[in-house]
Amino acid sequence: MKIFISHQQADTALAASIAKRLWLYHTINSYLDVIDPESSKKGDQLGDHIRDELGKCDQLLAVVSYATKGSWWVPWEIGVATEKDYPIATYAGDKTSLPEYLKKWPYLQSEQELDVYAKVSKQAHETYVNNKRHLNEEVSRKSGRRLFYRQLREKLGQS
């Protein structure tokens, strides 16, 4: 399991701390562009690279803050993850008021909620992997995604 952590450059420290916590406390791998030398590409090359990296992940966690309002990449990465039918959640580290389009997905505002997210993510991924043994890819992915959203919203009180 691997999570693509989408963030605006101003939120790099928060995104890195999230990636570290996911790994240290939950052994969940993540993709974070600050440690990727390829992320210095420009334009179409960068877009292609991000698509490739998203293709290696299972879901997207968007780190949002006041600075995200000026970002073009975070909404674009969310759009690519939506096309891929990946589970999506947001992390508002500075208690940022989320724009309407982000309220569609579960949102996290603390390390405790990040831990809940990690546990639910692992469980949904296990469901996906187990279902893939006897169901096709699309049905398995949909089942895991539905479980992810239902359980995470329920545990966060966002039902």
Which residues make up each language-model segment?
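C-terminal interaction surface of TIR/SEFIR-family domains
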Residues: A13, K95-S159
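Arginine/glycine-rich "motif VI" loop of SF2 helicases in the C-terminal RecA-like domain
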Residues: L24, G79-D94
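Structural motif
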Residues: Q59-A62
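Short low-complexity, flexible loop/linker segments enriched in glycine and/or proline
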Residues: Q45-G47, E77-I78, K103-Y107
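Conserved N-terminal substructure of TIR/SEFIR domains
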Residues: M1-C57, K142-S159
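Switch/connector loops and helix/strand junctions flanking conserved nucleotide-binding motifs
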Residues: S40, S71-W72, S97-L102
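Short beta-alpha junction loops
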Residues: Y66-A67, Y91-L98
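Conserved TIR/SEFIR loop-to-helix hotspot centered on a Trp-containing motif
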Residues: Y66-K84
